Amino acid sequence: MGYDLYVVTDETIGRGRTHTDLARLAAAGGADVIQLRDKRLPGRDLLSAAVAIREITTDAGALFIVNDRLDVAIAAGADGVHLGANDLPVGEARRIVPPGFLIGASVGSVAAAVRAAAEGADYVALSPTFATGSKDDAGPGCGLAALKEIRAAVSLPLVAIGGITAANVADVIAAGADGVAVISAVVGEGDVTAAARSLRDRIAAAKAEGR
């Protein structure tokens, strides 16, 4: 299972669609990974959404990741958890999760990527790769140069997140990313399934060109 197209749900830009709706539509468009992310929802409601998305991703053959909430991820039977810089440290999470449980880590530098790899991360995500409006606290983009540096420093799967669009996805793949994580480029679109499918096709074309 790869990380080519990694879709993060966000009800605030989902045009009235729920996390479950967005996950179903993105999975239909070929998303390889669905991440449930919502910093506002109470744990009980987040778990309810996670259980529903677990069923959707299982049927679609996609990975299911929960952002930040390790407890919800484990309770829902998710494939893994994604941890940001201010979340539980990767090493502590690795110590308590079941075997085979995936841990992803947001990183903003080579040093952070190397540290995450050493602590047991299964993949790292350069965040933000470009400036983005999807996360208020994302900060300025790290750029393609940082992506290339991290690619040279770690052998883990590398995902680019932040400001990824159809216009720049080929450059991101050429810089060494194994996949891209997107929010607005898919879940903010009117036709989520078509947006996911189009982006996935662009990723596949970029990878084929780089071979």
Swiss-Prot record:
Residue positions binding 4-amino-2-methyl-5-(diphosphooxymethyl)pyrimidine: Q35, L36, R37, D38, K39, N67, S106, K135
Sites where the protein binds 2-[(2R,5Z)-2-carboxy-4-methylthiazol-5(2H)-ylidene]ethyl phosphate: T132, G133, S134, G163, I183, S184
InterPro entries: Aldolase_TIM, ThiamineP_synth_sf, ThiamineP_synth_TenI, TMP_synthase
GO cellular component: cytoplasm
Gene Ontology molecular functions: magnesium ion binding; thiamine-phosphate diphosphorylase activity
Reactions the enzyme catalyzes: 2-[(2R,5Z)-2-carboxy-4-methylthiazol-5(2H)-ylidene]ethyl phosphate + 4-amino-2-methyl-5-(diphosphooxymethyl)pyrimidine + 2 H(+) = thiamine phosphate + CO2 + diphosphate; 2-(2-carboxy-4-methylthiazol-5-yl)ethyl phosphate + 4-amino-2-methyl-5-(diphosphooxymethyl)pyrimidine + 2 H(+) = thiamine phosphate + CO2 + diphosphate; 4-methyl-5-(2-phosphooxyethyl)-thiazole + 4-amino-2-methyl-5-(diphosphooxymethyl)pyrimidine + H(+) = thiamine phosphate + diphosphate
Record keywords: Magnesium, Metal-binding, Thiamine biosynthesis, Transferase
Pathway linked to the protein: Cofactor biosynthesis; thiamine diphosphate biosynthesis; thiamine phosphate from 4-amino-2-methyl-5-diphosphomethylpyrimidine and 4-methyl-5-(2-phosphoethyl)-thiazole: step 1/1
Cofactor note: Binds 1 Mg(2+) ion per subunit.
EC number annotated for this UniProt entry: 2.5.1.3
Naturally occurring in which organism (per UniProt): Methanoculleus marisnigri (strain ATCC 35101 / DSM 1498 / JR1)
Signal peptide positions (record): none
One of the GO BP terms on file: thiamine diphosphate biosynthetic process
Lineage top rank: taxon: Archaea
Protein name, UniProt field: Thiamine-phosphate synthase
Protein's gene: thiE
Cofactor(s) needed by this chain: Mg(2+)
Entry binding sites for Mg(2+): D68, D87
Known function: Condenses 4-methyl-5-(beta-hydroxyethyl)thiazole monophosphate (THZ-P) and 2-methyl-4-amino-5-hydroxymethyl pyrimidine pyrophosphate (HMP-PP) to form thiamine monophosphate (TMP).
Family under the similarity heading: Belongs to the thiamine-phosphate synthase family.
